[in-house]
Amino acid sequence: GKTASVIWAADYLMTQKIIKRVLVICPLSIMDSAWRNDLFRFAMHRRVDVAYGKPEKRRDIIGSEAEFVIINFDGVEIVSEAIANGKFDLIVVDEANAYKNPQTKRWKILSKLLQPHTWLWMLTGTPASQSPVDAYGIAKLVNPDGVPRFYGGFRDQVMNKVTQFKWVPKPDANNTVHKALQPAIRFTKE
């Protein structure tokens, strides 16, 4: 579902000449099994390559004519400078929970790669997997003006402090998270 939907939407934007290049950031385990296979199945007319291996090879692939470049989370850090110069119009992050913490090096690197003209699509089945505050890092990337500048401000919007070290979600926390993650598309099983 998610992968095919993204491929069709990106292909449509390419057909309309709105975007030219897409960087897909995903776990190593699904680079081939999900992304490369689905791109071959749903967009076989597009040039696709996987940026994996030695840094020089990754840089060459990022600088190539590939319309879709697939790279794993850790690979982004290795070749972030090449990515910044790679003229990507759309960055797709699959399993976006890997970017829930804005204090991590991974999050900071992705944040620096985002330019005003860069589109960012973050895919996740669980934007607030453990707690409503887990959505902060994702929301800060997707909609930076939709959340407080600092984590503590968001935490105070979605959580109540019970004791010095215990916080519980506020009754309207899910609505606050939903608003913070806009614009978003949400599919349910119903």
Model feature map: region roles:
Residues S5, I18-R41, S129-D134:
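Conserved Walker A/P-loop ATP-binding site and its immediately adjacent core
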Residues I30-K54, V142-D145:
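Conserved helix-turn-beta segment of the N-terminal RecA-like "Helicase ATP-binding" lobe
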Residues I19, V48, L90, W107-E190:
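Conserved P-loop NTPase motor "coupling/switch" region that bridges the ATPase
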Residues T3-I18, F40, I109-S111, L141-V142:
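Walker A/P-loop NTP-binding motif
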Residues P55-F88:
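Conserved helix/coil segment N-terminal to the catalytic DExD/H
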Residues D94-E95:
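Walker B catalytic acidic pair
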Residues G1, V76-V79, A98-P102, S129-Q130:
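Catalytic P-loop NTPase motifs of RecA-like helicase/translocase cores
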